[in-house]
Amino acid sequence: ADVAVTASRVSVQLPPHPSDVSFGCGMDIGWLENQTCSLLVQNGNSIRYELKAGGNEQYLRTYILGWGMSMLAIQRNEVALHCSAISDDAAAILFCGESGSGKSTLTSAYLARGYHLMADDMSFVSYHNETVMAKAAFPYQKLCRDAALRSGHPLDSLIYIDEAKDKYLVPCHEIFDDTSRPVKAIIILGKAPVSQVWLHKLEGLDAFHACVNNLFLRHLLKEKKYAPATAGQCLKIASKVPVYVILRPLEADTTGEVIETAFAITSKVR
């Protein structure tokens, strides 16, 4: 369904709240207020925003596409997972993990083998008719400077989006899959004090907690991430989709081994 994103005097439309509360997230209304902007999300189809004096427009865009869309997902009985998503024209595979865990590197390895990009940073995931479905996001990939140069696009033609991490927004229209796909696997990436690449399949409550802890809004929601609207969907996802963890050593470069471990998993899952 379409989403209307409009500028409005949101600051005077927010529900009453204590001064130390900066957001609300419910099935009917979601809102956010910070130094950059005020956001009001309603009915699963409307995001209204107000850029505050001195607010950064790039930060505003990030809040709308990240936090605003995540609140919208909840109102649609979906969850927004912090993940990269790729597809093989039949099913989707989701790569979750904190920043720096290797999601972009693993995604690029799959794209090089003919897979299609569905999402770079966030995907709407829902449970319908006994099936977990992932929606495509935007046909762009956030890449660091070296990877952006390797993509073949002149840097001055790209959007520079992250000074702290030196990243660019790179178009991927020719390899983008805009179709909703059933999810066949979730792979969570991370670094840990291990001596070699470590693979483990999560079961039961461990898989459930892993889904909850990879919600896009997890840091904002804190303990509220276990509210029925999000936890219920995560429980269904974890019960239907195999969830794996791949950990790599803190220091050694094990990129190739992580990639091959992931391919070994996804080649077997149907």
Feature map (PLM): residue ranges:
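Short Lys/Arg-enriched alpha/beta "domain-start" segment
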Residues: A1-P15
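Charged, amphipathic alpha-helical linker segments immediately N-terminal to NTP-binding catalytic cores
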Residues: G26-Q75
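Glycine-rich, often acidic-flanked micro-motifs
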Residues: S84, D88-G97, R113-R270
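Walker A (P-loop) phosphate-binding loop of P-loop NTPases
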Residues: G100
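Conserved lysine of the Walker
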Residues: K103
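Post-Walker A alpha-helix
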Residues: L106-T107
